[in-house]
């Protein structure tokens, strides 16, 4: 039950999700049961949530007394807090008692716990965080966006394969086009890792467009056509992600200062809001583990849960296993 605004935002997001999901779906709220139960009761008497009371029977509370803080070191947290909501929640999935896991808690701990509990698919060297980036065309998948600060050329190729499955299953793209993020479109541009990765991607049997530049991300396309998947290491990916997150608020402030109506601007820039997409799957683990922003609102949690449901319903995890076998 992690996140900067937990448990309120997490429980509220779960209620919103239950209100929109098919009635056959249920949720497990994992955390300190007394705290979660009190939060659930408090929300259901609020005007904006009271109509969701009929869905409470679809929300099961699972006790997990330990709390992994945002400041905890991942390895120490996993060893020292075995009854945290993160570990308990992931173990439910590993034991077949749930189908997916969503958290807005400590990202490093979630990554480490997912690898320990769910384990990696056979052949996967490292998992990658796959984040949806809004563009002037359609959203694109960028990975890795923070799991691995250093990557080998082989790992970047593997990330491309993971991203292709994501684009096919969750975005409905046919023969997704892959770009390698670099400092120029020419194959010889970039560092040693990106130049070797370029050669490997050309021979990987994917719809590889070649190198793409930072300016191509907002457009969702390069000179060679539309982009569906962008591959980079987690250091670069996370820098780009954090920059993207700051764009909408910055533009809004600038235009409001210039006299443009704030409500109008927020509506126009809605697609740049991370809460629209909710969460990013940790691809490569043998299960569904969705990483949400630490500052996730109830709406963001709701959308992250919907991403998890979509991943389960499209059997994305099985497809990844077959694709990398």
Predicted feature descriptions by range:
Residues 58-59, 140, 206:
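Short, conserved active-site loop motifs that form the nucleotide-linked donor/cofactor pocket
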